[in-house]
């Protein structure tokens, strides 16, 4: 690896850890603010869950980027996992905000998650990567 690639890798890792740290600070602020104001009565657990899933998504995205930079190829499993986590996060946001989920939206969500699950299974069985 040349110096430019190493510098780019270092900057990407630094930005990743900064983004993760800022999400954790936001998470801790949310918890302490709820404790101070409502003594856990108003603690909205879906906000905490969404913030934790944000951290996982940030980590997965940057891991994919770093592996693509290092190996000069993209691991399909990382993209599928990130897409699944992101989609589950979006579903949880809709469900925990008590919005009405239409039947067509529910079927579409199930089909998308099912397709991603099948893709993940096929990847694990056949180990296909994109170069």
UniProtKB/Swiss-Prot annotation:
Highest taxon in the source lineage: Bacteria
Keyword Lyase carried by entry: no
Annotated membrane topology: Multi-pass membrane protein
Subcellular location: Cell membrane
Chain segments annotated as transmembrane: 7-29, 49-69, 76-98, 102-124
Chief location: membrane
GO cellular component: plasma membrane
Pfam families: PsiE
Keywords: Cell membrane, Membrane, Transmembrane, Transmembrane helix
Name this polypeptide is given: Uncharacterized protein aq_293
Source species: Aquifex aeolicus (strain VF5)
């Amino acid at each position: 690896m040349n110096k430019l690639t190493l510098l780019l890798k270092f900057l990407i890792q630094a930005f990743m850890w900064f983004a993760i740290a800022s999400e954790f600070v936001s998470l801790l602020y949310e918890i302490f603010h709820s404790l101070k104001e409502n003594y856990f009565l108003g603690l909205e657990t879906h906000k905490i869950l969404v913030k934790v899933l944000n951290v996982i998504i940030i980590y997965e995205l940057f891991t994919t980027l770093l592996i693509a930079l290092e190996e000069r190829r993209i691991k399909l499993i990382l993209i599928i996992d990130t897409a699944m986590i992101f989609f589950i996060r979006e579903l949880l946001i809709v469900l925990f905000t008590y919005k009405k989920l239409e039947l067509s939206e529910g079927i579409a969500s199930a089909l998308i998650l099912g397709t991603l699950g099948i893709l993940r299974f096929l990847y694990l069985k056949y180990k296909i990567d994109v170069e």
